[in-house]
Amino acid sequence: MLEIKSNETDLAARIIVVGVGGAGNNAVNRMVDEQIKGVEFIGVNTDKQALQLCKAPKQLQIGEKLTKGLGAGAKPEIGEKAAEESIEEITSALKGSDMVFVTCGMGGGTGTGAAPVVAKVAKEMGVLTVGVVTKPFRFEAKTRMNNALSGLERLKENVDTLIVIPNDKLLEIVDRRTTLPDALKKADEVLQQSVQGVTDLINTPSDINLDFADVQTVMRDKGIAHVGIGTGTGDDKAMDAVKAAVASPLLETTISGATDIILNITGDISLIEAQAVSYTHLRAHETGRNL
């Protein structure tokens, strides 16, 4: 059942963020709160009651016959079957899109099982498909981590690019007083920054023009990806920003060995600073194929 709350505006490139399962819905909620422009949001869940709390303008309850409006009970096979039951609705919701971000928390039932199905639908339609997902904390049940790893493998087969955020990395950047919800917001920021970065590149005029074709060249059929965001102030603002972006403490990947890079520079910097930033990126990944 697809519920549409509002109309969407036409975009140069139609970009959709699909939040699957509880964690995916929460990530979408935070992006809606941040008022990200140039993106459509869809919440997908088996749990009808949880889905009603999702702020996405479009909501898709999957597997109504299978789950009777309840959750997947932490069983990925139920999430997968629920998505397959609602395959026509998923296809309809993604029709006409140019790029789809699929986000979820790996390890549970709906996200782990349904996200690969949603991604497969998008990719088979020729849509540029990106997965942005979290891995469970090590202190969580072993079964949950095993489910997550299996789900990641299935998702990797059905996306062009995959960004993985291990929740354990959150422990390295927060202090002892940080609550779990506040820590998880940090993981959602990676999704938000990834989406915002791409939409800004495509839809915002800049000195060096990039369009959706350029984004596709870098992200199509590329596998595991590394995303980094950095900011800086003062005399060394440009280099401080690029060093922070390359470090990207929430990811277990590094920029070393990357075959292609999208570099977006925003701010009042000189040509020399821009050159230094680009050179630092090139040295970091040591290939220079596409920048």
Where would I find each of the regions flagged by the language model?
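Tubulin/FtsZ superfamily GTPase core signature
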Residues: 1-289
